[in-house]
Amino acid sequence: MSDYKELTKQGLWKNNPGLVQLLGLCPLLAVTATLTNALGLGLATMLVLIGSNILVSLVRDFVPKEIRIPVFVMIIAALVTTVQLLINAYAYGLYLSLGIFLPLIVTNCVIIGRAEAFASRNSVAKSAFDGLMMGLGFTLVLSVLGAAREILGQGTLFYGADQLLGEWAKSLTIHIWQVNTSFLLAMLPPGAFIGMGLLIALKNAIDQYLATKQPKVEQEAPTRARITKVN
């Protein structure tokens, strides 16, 4: 149980793919203009991450080390294609909105990194849980950044939720304030870089604050051994 607790801490906070490892920055910065897009890409990435970890863990004893990376990439590509077809069939608006960044999940270093560093060396259950926590941590960063940019940029939240959840989700759109023109800095990539930097700074500040609250372990002063000369 302690192993799963540690995996949870690593994926959500200590070793978060977005805030600590700084992996997957291309889609993270390009697609997070709205919360809906951020959630869509985050959930797609999480599904691929869980599936790839499970499959890699299953075949880890049968794949020669010399060709393991190409095999892992093929597994990831097959899963991404499956997820892409599902989104195209059931959430076409989101499919158009995500564009090229959906198939680019194949090149996301988070997925290939976890497949190589964890799934290829651990059991199926632990690999699946690691994929879930890492994917959830990545999705949370995407969602927070997407929500902040959407609020600052156009004064709404969950705009276009019907692209992800269907027609009924149009009622989920929240108009926080009325804006005549969009705040372009928040909507464009420079705003994403600034927002991401602020999130990383906030996490580091929280870590430093928590570190100061930890009880300090006092080290015992070394005692000098007294040597008595024996004649």
UniProtKB/Swiss-Prot annotation:
Compartments it resides in: Cell inner membrane
Keyword Electron transport (UniProt): yes
Major site of localization recorded for this protein: membrane
GO biological process, one term: electron transport chain
Membrane topology, record value: Multi-pass membrane protein
Entries under Pfam families matching the protein: Rnf-Nqr
Transmembrane segments: 18-38, 39-59, 69-89, 93-113, 128-148, 182-202
Entry keywords, A to Z: Cell inner membrane, Cell membrane, Electron transport, Membrane, Translocase, Transmembrane, Transmembrane helix, Transport
InterPro entries assigned to the protein according to its UniProt record, in alphabetical order: NqrDE/RnfAE (IPR003667), RnfE (IPR010968)
Presence of keyword Electron transport: yes
GO cellular component, one term: plasma membrane
Entry's EC annotation: 7.-.-.-
Protein function: Part of a membrane-bound complex that couples electron transfer with translocation of ions across the membrane.
PANTHER family from the UniProt entry: ELECTRON TRANSPORT COMPLEX PROTEIN RNFE, ION-TRANSLOCATING OXIDOREDUCTASE COMPLEX SUBUNIT E
Family under the similarity heading: Belongs to the NqrDE/RnfAE family.
Protein name: Ion-translocating oxidoreductase complex subunit E
